[in-house]
């Protein structure tokens, strides 16, 4: 990474124009094959690639030339066998160049990200805990109980190919690199139309294409979220100036810039008083939550501005039905594997004044999280642990494994789910999921030994697997040690948010 910094610092005014020459450097392909960029790749590689080929300037230029030649040849050749050979060669060329191209596209953003992380480490101790998915829920627990409305927002799709290229044009002005990116997108398999998350998700996150398309998707989402920053700043400036100034809207942005500059000198302390602290935004993958203490009319204005920004900025229909506004007091929203809501509890207080006494019901708001059983059962049924009704079935594909491996696989899934859903205020749904997995494990073992579940339990006892599935062993896939002390006892209904969970269990993710 230090070498890349020196490379870009040679001419700071033109640092974004030097990406394409890196495509002809051999060490770029070593980085691509080893999936190493000073630890900046956050997703796990599906395969352990071995770098055993040399890529020089001549070889890469020859591959790029052959890619274009094969593209022209495929339109002229009619023979089916030759067409098949042409497609196979094209895929090889694309995949080879694509691996190096993915690394190159990440370099400018990686340098910026690394510098920002170093700055935050100096300000925020233990910043690694902020990577935990569970770190979101204490924030929701603390803030949502004071808010009134919530908007469920789904990031707009489908994404046209040209939009992905246009998003990067604001960051990378290297024309040859953008042309090569456009060529990749239009030539790869079924990428000549639209990207839809249902049909193309397996291709979008396939082993070979995962790196580049995750980068493109994150860039697109970042561009979508820039609307929130723009609208938030606009709302802030409007609150910091008198309403009468903006009755006439001609040269609106010029007025904002002029007035803010003038008033900031004299009213710098007063500006902070107008900042609205009651609008919060949280996103995970393609779904986000926008919560506010304002009225329903205010939330409708935010929705209107967001839709118009997306529609004008990306030049596509922004699908208004993908933003739902609801009142927190009577609506639950599904987010990150939890069904969350704000519950109002009434506590009766006796008050006495002189000789008179009376009862008062005091309402208190509490953030409530439960495990949604229907989506989880759907995920278990899709993974062949039960049927659509939740009735446990055996797992035939695991019947050839040893007994220890079968129990270990079921136990790992159980501990993962228990660990992630430890923040649930009601555990009944989680107990049902554990029961399904426990009985599915027993049916799998009985199938392997050509026995019945009843005979299996009778021989090993009714407490078979009970102790194993309630074991509080740490999940092996986690990185950071748990912050909970071993002596801490969990009380009924107590919520625990861990700061060591960096990914959602696949069963939760698919629900």
From Swiss-Prot:
Top-level division of the source organism's lineage: Eukaryota
InterPro entries associated with the record: Domain_X (IPR024937), Maturase_MatK (IPR002866), Maturase_MatK_N (IPR024942)
Keywords, comma-separated and alphabetical: Chloroplast, mRNA processing, Plastid, RNA-binding, tRNA processing
Localization, UniProt: Plastid, Chloroplast
Entry keyword annotation includes tRNA processing: yes
A Pfam match: Intron_maturas2
Keyword RNA-binding: yes
Main location: plastid
Single Gene Ontology MF annotation: RNA binding
GO cellular component: chloroplast
GO terms (BP aspect): mRNA processing; RNA splicing; tRNA processing
Function: Usually encoded in the trnK tRNA gene intron. Probably assists in splicing its own and other chloroplast group II introns.
PANTHER family: MATURASE K
Family to which this protein belongs: Belongs to the intron maturase 2 family. MatK subfamily.
Listed name of the protein: Maturase K
Organism: Acorus calamus var. americanus
């Amino acid at each position: 990474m230090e070498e890349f910094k020196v490379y870009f610092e040679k001419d700071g005014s033109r640092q974004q124009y030097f990406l394409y020459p890196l495509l002809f450097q051999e060490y770029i392909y070593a980085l691509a094959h080893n999936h190493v960029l000073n630890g900046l790749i956050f997703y796990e590689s599906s395969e352990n690639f071995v770098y055993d080929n040399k890529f020089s300037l001549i070889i890469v230029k020859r591959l790029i030339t052959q890619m274009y030649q094969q593209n022209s040849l495929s339109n002229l050749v009619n023979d089916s066998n030759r067409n098949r050979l042409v497609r196979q060669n094209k895929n090889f060329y694309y995949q080879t160049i694509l691996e190096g191209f993915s690394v190159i596209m990440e370099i400018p953003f990686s340098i910026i990200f690394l510098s920002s992380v170093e700055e935050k480490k100096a300000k925020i101790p233990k910043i690694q805990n902020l990577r935990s998915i569970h770190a979101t829920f204490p924030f929701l627990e603390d803030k949502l109980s004071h808010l009134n409305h919530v908007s469920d927002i789904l990031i707009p799709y489908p994404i046209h190919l040209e939009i992905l290229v246009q998003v990067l044009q604001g960051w990378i002005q290297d024309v040859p690199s953008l042309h090569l990116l456009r060529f990749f997108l239009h030539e790869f398999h079924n990428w000549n139309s639209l990207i839809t998350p249902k049909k193309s998700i397996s291709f979008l996150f396939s082993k070979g294409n995962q790196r580049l398309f995750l980068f493109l998707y994150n860039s697109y989402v970042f561009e979508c979220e820039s609307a929130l920053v723009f609208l938030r700043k606009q709302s802030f400036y409007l609150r910091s100036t008198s309403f009468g100034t903006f009755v006439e809207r001609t040269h609106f942005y010029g007025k904002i810039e002029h007035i803010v500059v003038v008033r900031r000198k004299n009213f710098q302390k007063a500006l902070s008083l107008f900042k609205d602290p009651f609008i919060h935004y949280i996103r995970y993958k393609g779904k986000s939550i926008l919560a506010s203490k304002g009225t329903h009319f205010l939330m409708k204005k935010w929705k209107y501005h967001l839709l118009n920004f997306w529609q004008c900025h990306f030049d596509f229909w922004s699908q208004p039905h993908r933003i739902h506004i609801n009142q927190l007091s009577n609506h639950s929203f599904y987010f990150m594997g939890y069904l969350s809501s704000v519950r109002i509890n009434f506590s009766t207080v006796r008050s006495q004044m002189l000789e008179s006494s009376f009862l008062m019901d005091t309402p208190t708001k509490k953030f409530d999280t439960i495990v949604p059983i229907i989506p989880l059962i759907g995920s278990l049924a899709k993974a062949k642990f039960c049927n659509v009704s939740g009735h446990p079935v055996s797992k035939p594909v695991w019947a050839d494994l040893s007994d220890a491996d079968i129990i270990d696989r079921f136990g790992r899934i159980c501990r993962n789910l228990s660990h992630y859903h430890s923040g649930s205020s009601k555990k009944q749904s989680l107990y049902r999921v554990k029961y399904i997995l426990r009985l599915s494990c027993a049916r799998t073992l009985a199938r392997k030994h050509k026995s019945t579940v009843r005979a299996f339990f009778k021989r090993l006892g009714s407490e078979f697997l009970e102790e194993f599935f309630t074991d509080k062993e740490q999940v092996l896939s986690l990185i950071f040690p748990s912050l909970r002390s071993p002596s801490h006892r969990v009380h009924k209904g107590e919520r625990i948010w861990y700061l060591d969970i960096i990914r959602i269990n696949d069963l939760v993710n698919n629900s």
